[in-house]
Amino acid sequence: MTHREVGISSVSELGQMVRAVRKESGLTQRDAAALCNVSLPFLNGLEQGKATAQIGKVLSVCNRFGIDVRLRLPGETA
């Protein structure tokens, strides 16, 4: 799998990335939710950019799709 780096600054942008990777994987939301062990409403909310998503579940979904979430702390360079 090739990787590309994408910066995000909102829950909405993260949801868009999750949706794009899910679709690239050829999965329906229902199948992806089962694969990630989350509910269909949760995955739908994440993809819609709802700010109420639980970070643990968000990270689980990202991890399952190979989305590496990184933090850039102040003072660090790229």
Locate predicted features:
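DNA major-groove recognition helix of helix-turn-helix/homeodomain DNA-binding modules
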Residues: Q54-R72
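Residue-level signal for the short linker/turn that defines the boundary of a DNA-recognition helix
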Residues: Q16, G26-L27, A53
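Residue-level recognition of specific faces of alpha-helices
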Residues: S10, M17, F42-G45, K57-V58
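N-terminal flexible/basic segments that precede or flank functional cores
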Residues: M1-E13, Q48, N63, D68, ...
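Residue-level detection of the helix-turn-helix DNA-binding "recognition helix"
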Residues: K23, N37, Q48-K50
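Short alpha-helical DNA-recognition segment
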Residues: L27-F42
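Short amphipathic helical patch at the helix-1/turn junction of helix-turn-helix
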Residues: S12, R22-K23
